[in-house]
């Protein structure tokens, strides 16, 4: 991870950690970098944004930087991250840029970069961009006269994405009552358009963005509102998206939440039964629930475990030609249809399973039972030394042996905070607490523990 760009782009508090000047510099660099590859025409860079007030500021700054370096900036305006990915790869853009901080509060924002096929930008290019931001910007030439780039409204790209989504399901959603929680974010128009076009009776909440209400007590991080709405309106299913709609969680007809693990299980099992799961493998991260692996074993489905982050899930899928992978949080990638997590595609795939099987979501999810989980964040004097400590390693081994096939423990470094994450899954919450506390006690005895964070 670099100074500015992490696993999910350049993110921070708007106007503090991420400023309009940063956005302008990103645009300047991208415009210059891709213009070098075009001798006869202009480089083309497509930009999307979510509904945060600061997204409009960053959109203008990016476009100014891009055009000042001689490239053309195409503006999708408010749209989803997966829409930018789709349009980048299908409309032959040099790269795509999404302005969003995903599920974060409105006062944060971010810049996500994608390569010409809609994948996350490679680390080497982002490192070069960081060096430019911290270096002397004067060495890049300014475009002049007829070389100055154009800024082009590209609403039609968003409409093409909607058309693509509506082409994916093989059956109508007629007679299905579907609730959508759009988190006052990027999906607020697209979600309704897609489900209405597919014949669903669509009920939409949190589709009134005002620039500051994105993710506020709504969407996939506050799904309780959708749970209540599904029960009160007797809906068949509900889907909750985050601010840029690259993740999706579901609510069944009883108002119960299905996280990413349950959604992946349902889809993988259905596709396997239809001979549509290449290599019979699902890609997960190390944070997926122990219950998912138990259910996959029973269903005869193999699985891979990657580091936390949809970037690592996608890399594994691409390298091994796997088709379904994702995270418990609802970042799920269907690689046949997208090169990034797409909340709307996830919702469409789950609808397809419901319609194919003619079963309610509660029945489809019954095959997997989530194990209780306890996770504690622990500040230590040195993360690496603590992980290597013999007493701590012995405690982990003792917990693993005691749980056997009925649970697991996991000790890992946080990628974003100065803490270690201690997690246990077992048959009861009490058993989880016992195992986690045993590992923390070993840290304390070895002199590494500073505090257990609340």
Residue ranges and their predicted role:
Residues 1-64, 68-69, 148-178:
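An N-terminal, well-structured beta->alpha segment
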Residues 8, 47, 84, 97, ...:
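Buried hydrophobic positions in well-ordered alpha/beta secondary-structure cores of metabolic enzymes
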Residues 44-108, 193-251:
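N-terminal small/polar loop signature for handling phosphorylated ligands or for N-terminal nucleophile
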Residues 13, 109-233:
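Gly/Ser/Thr-enriched, mixed-charge loops and adjacent short helices
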Residues 5-6, 47, 73-78, 98-99, ...:
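General beta-strand structural signal in soluble alpha/beta enzymes
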Residues 48-50, 180-182, 252, 336, ...:
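Short glycine-centered, acidic/aromatic-flanked micro-motifs in structured strand/loop junctions
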Residues 127-162, 167, 253-325, 333-334:
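Proline/glycine-rich low-complexity loops and linkers
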Residues 237, 274-454:
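Phosphate-binding and adjacent anionic-ligand microenvironments
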């Amino acid at each position: 991870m670099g100074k500015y760009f992490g696993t999910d782009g350049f993110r921070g508090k708007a106007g503090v950690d991420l400023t309009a000047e940063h956005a302008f510099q990103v645009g300047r660099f991208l415009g210059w970098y891709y213009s070098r590859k075009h001798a006869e025409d202009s480089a083309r860079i497509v930009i999307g944004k979510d509904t945060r007030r600061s997204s409009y500021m960053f959109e203008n700054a990016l476009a100014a930087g891009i055009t000042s370096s001689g490239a053309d900036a195409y503006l999708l305006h408010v749209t989803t991250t997966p829409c930018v990915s789709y349009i980048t790869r299908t409309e032959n853009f040099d790269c795509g840029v999404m302005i969003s901080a995903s599920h974060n509060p409105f006062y944060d924002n971010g810049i996500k970069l994608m390569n010409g096929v809609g994948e996350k930008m490679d680390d080497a290019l982002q490192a070069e961009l960081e060096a430019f931001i911290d270096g002397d910007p004067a060495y890049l030439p300014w475009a002049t006269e007829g070389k100055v780039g154009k800024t082009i409204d590209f609403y039609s790209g968003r409409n093409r994405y909607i058309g693509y989504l509506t082409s994916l399901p093989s059956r109508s959603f007629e007679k299905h009552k579907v609730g959508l929680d759009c988190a006052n974010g990027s999906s607020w128009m697209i979600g309704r358009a897609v489900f209405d076009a597919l014949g669903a009776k669509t009920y939409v909440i949190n589709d009134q963005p005002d620039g500051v209400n994105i993710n506020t007590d709504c969407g996939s991080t506050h799904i309780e509102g959708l749970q209540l709405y599904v029960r009160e309106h007797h809906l068949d299913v509900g889907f909750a998206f985050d601010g840029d709609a690259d993740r999706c969680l579901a609510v069944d007809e009883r108002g119960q939440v299905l996280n990413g693990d349950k959604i992946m299980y349902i889809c993988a099992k259905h596709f396997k039964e239809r001979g549509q799961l290449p290599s019979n493998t699902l890609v997960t991260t190390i944070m997926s629930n122990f219950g998912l692996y138990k259910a996959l074993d029973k269903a005869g489905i193999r699985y891979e475990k990657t580091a936390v982050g949809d970037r690592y899930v996608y890399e594994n899928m691409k390298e091994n030609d796997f088709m379904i992978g994702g995270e418990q949080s609802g970042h799920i990638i269907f690689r046949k249809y997208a090169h990034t997590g797409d909340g709307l595609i996830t919702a469409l795939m789950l609808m397809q399973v419901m319609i194919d099987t003619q079963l309610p979501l509660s029945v489809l999810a019954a095959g997997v039972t989530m194990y209780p989980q306890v996770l504690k964040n622990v500040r230590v004097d040195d993360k690496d030394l603590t992980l290597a400590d013999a007493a701590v390693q012995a405690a982990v081994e003792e917990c693993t042996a005691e749980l056997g096939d009925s649970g697991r423990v996991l000790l890992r470094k946080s990628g974003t905070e100065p803490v270690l994450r201690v997690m246990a899954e077992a048959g009861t919450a009490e058993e989880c607490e016992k195992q986690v506390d045993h590992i923390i006690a070993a840290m304390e005895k070895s002199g590494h523990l500073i505090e257990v964070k609340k």
